[in-house]
A protein has these predicted regions:
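Short, small-residue-biased leader/transition segments that mark boundaries at the very start
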Residues: 1-6
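Short linear interaction motifs
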Residues: 237-243, 479
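Extended, non-globular alpha-helical segments
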Residues: 81-84
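Short, low-complexity, charge-dense intrinsically disordered segments
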Residues: 7, 13-34
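Acidic/aromatic-lined carbohydrate-recognition and catalytic surfaces
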Residues: 96-196, 202-234, 238
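Carbohydrate-binding surfaces of carbohydrate-active enzymes
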Residues: 41, 50-51, 56-63, 73-79, ...
Length: 620
């Protein structure tokens, strides 16, 4: 189960039950507080006084996205900071948004941000940078992609009937050509060939080449960047982080606490998200060193087996090549974007927070990232994005909160309330905050507070949690409540005993050309069952009043161990491990589970045993 253990709460011999006093400080209609009341037992007055005091600290108060979306004027910036203070906020993320008239990253922009930092500091509030013009992080408003080598790239698959060789035109940036025999949409056999004349009669010519992302107005006439390319990432850091450092680097780690990275991704896998061109569903991520790195890590040549990446082979829904491909992409993203970014920030005193692109379903994680939990490992305060109201993706904050517990991270962020609309009441804001707090969210980033609602800005993810809303003078009650709640949780350890092996790696191997619809919907029955089991298992556990964390197999391989009857990931130990719905499991995970069970740990396999180990089919 889940128990909240209060650190240092019994420093004296005073054993009076102060639970009701605590509940009078924080309203009782919150599930987390009832959990606290019935699990903690006795709480001393010293602890309660500390909670009241801590609840007033900016550290525990929300920091909204301050949508800087017009012509910035210092008097108006100062006025709005005062409004934030009155609304109970503890600072703000300084965020360029649609409608910005001041030149992004220009001298005036930098002066205005420095002014905001100083004004926030005068009021005892925190400043947090945001690393992009709108989103996603990496382009500096598109300018990084002016250099063509930095642009997002994809492998493209083209299928044609040209067995006589006359209709084939070798594309620019050619990779490989195959003669392929299909049975419907499944591979029967394939052979790499050197020319179209070698295509066997009755078979298809399947050609692979790579292409740059097409320019887009969203990126100011350029593209997203190749986040798998370390040189592109260096250019991004130089264009943004280094510029901020030169302007006000002496404030890093002091007045300026950290920086928000938003919707980082490595490009879409078979779903065309953000691409939008006619071939987008035929595309998977590519970078210059892809084939070299793949062979180094997986010990075989991806070029020789590209058809198995795209198509189901020999009656199997699961592809070892697709499984390996997503794994290599994940490793390259971490090595070339995540780790260098975090290293730069650590060396310069900035906390890294934010969230990646699409965390909801397994398909979302697979198509745009691979493993969100592996990415969270390298964020100081891992975070999520929860759009809309009553968006009960309970397992998403649990993914970030699990990593935070396992690797000792102080806060877990949620970018919340975005596009929730103008009908939201204060009770609605509290309700959506409550369930996320119960799932481990301790750093609130309300989305969005408009600088102005002129022009296009008024259509940017309403409502505005700012003075444009009539209730803004009453909103402080919401934030006072949550700041005290977060102060409570900062003094607590959530003693979760149960671990669920996260099934995302099974989704990697079920990915294929034609396997996704409407971006994140899946077409194959086995993939649908995997998604359903993922949702149903966590929901069932929660409804039974039991808590559980998730364990990512990559993180288990890196930081897992069995010790004294507990299975540890990093610094968090578990008494019980649940394996449910997996199509594949790592051999390293199995070995650790065997060791854990031998020490007296409990391992529960729910439903069928995985059919694959390390992506290879089990034959006995």
């Amino acid at each position: 189960g889940s128990e909240m253990c209060i650190r240092d709460s019994l420093k004296t011999d005073d054993k009076r039950d102060y639970s009701d006093v605590l509940l009078s400080i924080i309203p009782v209609n919150s599930a987390p507080i009832w959990e606290l009341k019935y699990k903690c037992g006795y709480i001393d007055m010293e602890f309660i006084e500390e909670i009241v005091k801590n609840g007033e600290r900016s550290e525990f108060k929300a920091k909204p996205f301050w949508s800087l979306n017009g012509k910035l004027e210092k008097d108006e910036l100062s006025r709005q900071i005062e409004v934030f203070k009155k609304m109970g906020f503890g600072g703000a993320f300084l965020h360029s948004r649609t409608g910005l008239k001041t030149e992004y990253m220009g001298e005036e922009w930098l002066d205005d941000l420095e002014f905001c930092v100083e004004e926030l500091e005068k009021r005892g509030m925190e400043s947090w940078l945001y690393d992009e013009d709108r989103w996603p992080s990496g382009t500096c408003g598109g300018t990084v992609a002016k250099k063509k080598a930095n642009r997002l790239k994809s492998i493209v698959c083209d299928i044609s009937d040209c067995s006589d060789g006359k209709n084939f035109v070798k594309p620019k940036r050619f990779i490989a050509l195959f003669s392929v025999l299909f049975d419907g949409d499944r591979l029967v056999s394939y052979k790499r060939v050197n020319s179209a004349e070698e295509i066997v009669k009755g078979e298809k010519a399947v050609c692979f080449y790579w292409a740059y992302m097409l320019p887009s107005d969203f990126y100011n006439g350029y593209t997203y960047i190749d986040t798998l390319n370390k040189n592109a990432v260096k250019d991004f850091l130089k264009s943004t982080n280094e510029v901020y450092k030169e302007k006000f680097g002496e404030k890093f780690g002091k007045e300026i606490k950290g920086i928000f990275q938003d919707e980082v991704n490595r490009g879409p896998l078979f779903n065309g998200f953000v691409l939008g061109d006619k071939d987008c569903l035929k595309k998977v991520p590519y970078t210059y060193r892809l084939f070299e790195e793949f062979k180094k890590i997986k010990k075989y040549d991806l070029k020789e087996r590209l058809p198995e990446l795209y198509f189901r082979y020999r009656g199997e829904n699961f592809s070892k090549v697709a499984y390996d491909f997503v794994d290599v992409l994940m490793r390259m993203l971490l090595a070339n974007f995540t780790v260098p970014y975090g290293k730069w920030c650590k060396e310069n005193g900035l906390i890294v927070t934010g969230h990646v692109l699409h965390e909801d379903a397994l398909s979302c994680q697979t198509t745009m990232m691979g493993s969100v939990m592996q990415y969270y490992r390298y964020m100081d305060y891992p975070g999520i994005d929860n759009l809309g109201s009553c968006n009960y993706c309970y397992e998403v904050p649990k993914l970030a909160a699990s990593v935070a517990k396992q690797f000792g991270k102080k806060f877990v962020l949620s970018e919340m309330y975005g596009v929730s609309g103008w009908r939201m009441s204060l009770n609605d804001y509290k309700h959506d905050g409550d369930w996320q707090a119960f799932m481990g969210i301790t750093f609130r980033c309300p989305h969005l507070s408009w600088y102005t609602m002129k022009g296009e800005a008024k259509r940017d993810c309403p409502a505005s949690i700012m003075s444009q809303s009539g209730w803004y003078t009453e909103y402080k009650a919401v934030e006072d409540y949550f700041s005290r709640l977060d102060a409570v949780f900062s003094c607590c350890d959530e003693m979760t005993e149960n671990l669920i092996i996260h099934p995302v790696e099974s989704a990697w191997g079920l990915s294929r050309y034609g396997g996704y619809v409407d971006y994140f919907g899946v077409t194959d029955d086995e993939y649908k069952r995997l998604e359903k089991n993922y949702k149903d298992l966590f929901g069932m556990i929660q409804k039974c009043g039991v808590d559980a964390d998730y364990g990512d197999e990559g993180l288990i391989a890196e930081s897992g161990r069995a010790e004294n009857g507990l299975l540890y990931i990093g610094e968090k130990g578990y008494k019980r491990v649940v394996v449910s719905g997996l199509v594949t499991i790592r051999s390293s995970t199995l070995a650790l589970l065997n060791e854990f069970e031998a020490q007296g740990g409990e391992v529960l396999f729910v439903s069928e045993f995985p059919r694959f180990i390390d992506g290879i089919k089990v034959t006995d």
